[in-house]
């Protein structure tokens, strides 16, 4: 369990107020949810805008800030609103020890940002930088984000990149981005490498007993459409079913449109909310209602069903324990088995981004269903036919 301490520490920090107020109750688990390209410096850096971020279900704010004073203000605003900030500024790189010593005890600090999507040649310098930061602060993790698999010529080259990153930079967690939902004309489809990327990252993280962080795309650009609830559910529940311990959205605030035509982020460039803001808020609330299933969970098996299963995945040939029947009638589904604090779970996800799934699932008397509001009901209270909207999940919990 030592490997998930950085994640759990961030999560527990966000519930410290409620724990103090309710000393005799266990804190409600909270999955860390990170807003990439968060609130910018300047006129929008206010308590009200940070509270708006928190109200949408985020726990970590990562603003791209290029002045020390702006980074300190972000720490202050995060502390005031129960958030944590991923800290970045030029001084963190030019004078890491002195800068870290100034901020390491700040209540708004969550992590230190190093770099996005480094190449192999960048890793030795990043390792030296990380060691300098860690020499001054062993409590808050350094953070960087890795490339997706399709940035490499082959899956094996990607695996080598991950392994080289871990051997050299050796951070407490892995993080990578992969934005799978594409649209060409009226056709919406998943990148063929999406599930392969999850397979690789989940496996590499488990082999090293480290958590991994994964993404959902919240901002349209290029061939990536304006996200719907179905699009976000597919990405986020897939991340969680594969064992991700922190969820990240790219982006929260709309970046400049000059290069990538970013548009319809949850918060647009003028500071107004788009319709995506309410979708993100809804999905985050839904995910946190079942956080006790996923936060701290360990993957025990991952399989797919369907006439054709995705690249890099494995076909389900044996039913999970207590599942008597599972028939998806040739459609694709992910079947993830998790264990968390002595309790076993089976997560069944519709892997289509466009089509509902009719799944026939029967269990024995040792299973409960974990409903979207987090409540539990005996699985025997329901019929065997379950209709899952695109990306959605059924969650079964073994009765203790």
Q: Where are each of the predicted segments found?
A:
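Bacterial Sec-dependent N-terminal signal peptides
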Residues: 1-23
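Glycan-processing catalytic domains of CAZymes
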Residues: 22-365, 373-400
